Swiss-Prot record:
Record key words, sorted: Calcium, Cell inner membrane, Cell membrane, Hydrogen ion transport, Ion transport, Magnesium, Membrane, Metal-binding, Translocase, Transmembrane, Transmembrane helix, Transport
Pfam families registered for this protein in UniProt: H_PPase (PF03030)
The organism of origin for this protein: Chlorobaculum tepidum (strain ATCC 49652 / DSM 12025 / NBRC 103806 / TLS)
Residue ranges of the TM segments: 1-21, 51-71, 78-98, 133-153, 161-181, 227-247, 257-277, 301-321, 327-347, 391-411, 420-440, 503-523, 538-558, 607-627, 629-649, 694-714, 716-736
Gene behind the chain: hppA
Name of the molecule in the record: K(+)-insensitive pyrophosphate-energized proton pump
Catalysed transformations (reactions): diphosphate + H2O + H(+)(in) = 2 phosphate + 2 H(+)(out)
Site (Important for ion transport): 176, 220, 227, 689, 700
Keyword Magnesium carried by entry: yes
Amino acid sequence: MYGLVVCLFGMIFGLIQYQGINKLPVHAAMKEISDLIYETCKTYLITQGKFIIILWALVAAIIVAYFGGLNHLAPDKVVFILACSLLGIAGSYTVAWFGMRINTFANSRTAFASLGGKPFPTYAIPLRAGMSIGMLLISIELFAMLCILLFIPVDYAGPCFIGFAIGESLGASVLRIAGGIFTKIADIGSDLMKIVFKIKEDDARNPGVIADCTGDNAGDSVGPTADGFETYGVTGVALISFILLAIKDPSIQVSLLVWIFAMRLVMIVASAVSYWVNDALAKMKYGNADEMNFEKPLITLVWLTSIVSIVLTYIASYMLIAQLGDGTMWWKLASIITCGTIAGALIPELVDRFTSTECAFVRNVVQCSKEGGAALNILSGLVAGNFSAYWMGLAIIVLMGAAFGFSTLGLDVMMLAPSVFAFGLVAFGFLSMGPVTIAVDSYGPVTDNAQSVYELSLIETLPNISNSIESEFGFKPDFENAKRYLEANDGAGNTFKATAKPVLIGTAVVGSTTMIFSIIMILTGGLADTGAIAKLSILWPPFLLGLLMGGAVIYWFTGASMNAVTTGAYYAVAFIKKNIKLDGVTKASTEDSKKVVEICTRFAQKGMINLFLTIFFSTLAFACLESYLFIGYLISIALFGLYQAIFMANAGGAWDNAKKVVETELHAKGTELHDASVVGDTVGDPFKDTSSVALNPIIKFTTLFGLLAIELAIKLPTTISVSLAVVFFLLSLVFVHRSFFSMRIAVDKD
């Protein structure tokens, strides 16, 4: 029950921050723009909600077949599992809506705060909004899981956890993928106008700008928030499944389950304490400063939270499991989680080395662009992405290796496959400062939108605006410094938007090993069947074929998601070029802006259908075809997906901040150098915000859904199973074909 109290504390913390941001001062012109962005986002999110329910019907059919037909659960219990899956969807959807709402409050308040002549409020408001999202997200997710654990009978809680996690994963997959497509169609459509018409960023006359602002929330707020909610849920379910399958002693099971949930409560406390301490330190240092490095206090917050979290992990472990095993298990398990916590702090630091405006790789992109234009800009960005994948992969390997080392110190007495449990705890440790990870990720869309709100409000052109602001709000606005603060803060936002992506994809990959182990336990009779275990090898051809197939699907997924962006952007650009009016108007018409939003929504929906249904039918096909082929497929998706996602996310981040350097430091807007940087940023848009980020929920959904699919498949007669595999595979090919040809741009005849 203490856990529920801590969850309520986290929710109250988030809601208090929400109310506080809503009450911050804001000029009417800026509030009008942020309200318009919110209304557009609301329409988009309602559309996606209807779409999620349609896809849920497909998943629900498999849940009914598995729990009702295969396991012969009573109808009322099957209905309750379905209700838990809907609860998972509702959780993802609710926190996504909350994140979108508070960010659309924060963007206009940040834009207005920049006029005060001091940079600190421009930093503090986006972070405050992010902490509100992070604390509420983790608290709601944990509250739901604690309710299942505490109030559902033990023999029935497992299926409810599975249903809840599948619902979370479905909601996150749709919102993350569709949001990623939407935002980059809008972003590219808006950005390319800077080259075509030589207009400034966020020019109010550009009909694509409102869609771009909507996309910042749909792709960089709604998607990541739902993704974060799902990540914490699925990682927890994977560990719960392992404990129930690999540990035979009920008393040890109970001790470890209590400990796991206590560690999740620790992350809430650690994040809240660290935020308050960091806020006080940042205020002392920068509160009255005229200049500040916006990245510095964010980096401090990440490391401070990791240190507090590690200390509390050891303290809580000693208090809860000091008597477990030989009396040393508490520090061994705490040390394994600490490996993940260090990874959660180290990965953002590594991301900073490849995407920050100050880093050597971004400076290399800028320098290459000066002589080689867009061609060398793109090549040097690819270099940054590839190098980042190496170093982040190495960091993850070293820390997983350390966790494996701890797992050899006697854990095998308590459980089967202790190394798998260790890897699951590493994934858990990745998330040990969850609210802060979400907060620094949410920082980016607010800073991006704040810049747009400032420009779209046309506040500098309003009659007698300086005197009006001084009269109403009590200060003289500083327009020049305001723009400079917003641009510099956006650079920090770009960097920290990039930091959460590898953390989340890392948890998907490391955590998926735990879920794959659950499938292996089913196939090998609890690791007792040596003949079955021998098939987990490249000496068993189906396993090798599965490894090859997983890589193929990852590369198709990358191409199909980018194609959805490319096609949508083509039509958005064509519409904007045809309808933009630059003479005699101060802003684009509402009708034209809505039309661009409509184009983005249409292609996001079409792309999402093809992507999700291909993954859905492929999972069923390979599970039905051959069990060990399916294991190879899952492993391959995780490994290929990890490096593809890291490479794409950081290459995109490097291109984005190279453009920021050209604009804010070199003041080269409107030059050939700027054009080259815009081209690079355009290529990077779907890299970092569509394909890479969508791989995280897809890996988790495939693994989690695969757990049901494989159990269904192995209990079917071989003839029926293979026949279904053929049918499902052909259906997947239909949507693979549609992912290009149904969205192909018509070729001009001339």
